[in-house]
Amino acid sequence: MEKNAAAEIATTADKTRLISPFAETVGSLAVEAMLYEVTCTPSPGLVDRVNSGAHTDMDFYSFMSSSAALSICMTRCVQAGLNHGGTLPALLPVLRRIGIDGEARMLQATGGVNTQKGLLFSLGIVAAAVGWLQHTRNRQDSGSILQCVAAMTAGIVTRELGNMDKSVTSLTAGEKLYRLHGVTGIRGEMEQGLPAVLEHGLPTLRQAMADHLTVNSALLQTLLVLMTVVDDTTVMNRHHP
């Protein structure tokens, strides 16, 4: 049964290689968001145009390379949502399959450096939610999109972090922080429907743009607000909590 299920997931993921114009449009917006993130300068503790922050193995150009490599993956995530006729939790294994391919592309582009695996996970799921809403309801708004994200990832913290039997030395950074400090990281944010984005990030960004700030200033203001409410496990790990 598991073998058949895996084959079905692989077939479903492969179907996303046939891309619709809608998926191309949303996928390009996802890549634009990825590029905007790294061009926001200064970004304390993070990679930006002039500094690598807490990172010693990557820089601005690493992110340019990986963003380009992940572009097709983002489009395929949108297409996966458009194609999906089942429940939202059933879409997640398909996205994981696409994500594995995306991660391989990213690592090849960066010489083996993990620049945007977390963003591949989070933004890929958001992109798929947009596709699913277009297919099922012909609508997209931030609240509905993030409700879909929560439904798609329901129970992910317990499944992936709550039942670990690994030794501490074999844990990933996120797993170690959860075991030692109870930090749920991006999985917890996704399972809750990215509340920091909905309640803090988006209102701040929209107000900044309404106040006619430059794009960089608006992004920086949004970043600083998010830093007050989000636990960044990457920065926490690289600064040895």
Give each language-model segment a name.
Residues 1-85, 92, 130-241:
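Phosphate-rich cofactor/ligand-interacting catalytic cores and adjacent structured alpha/beta frameworks
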Residues 74-132:
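Long, hydrophobic/aromatic-enriched structural stretches that serve as scaffold segments
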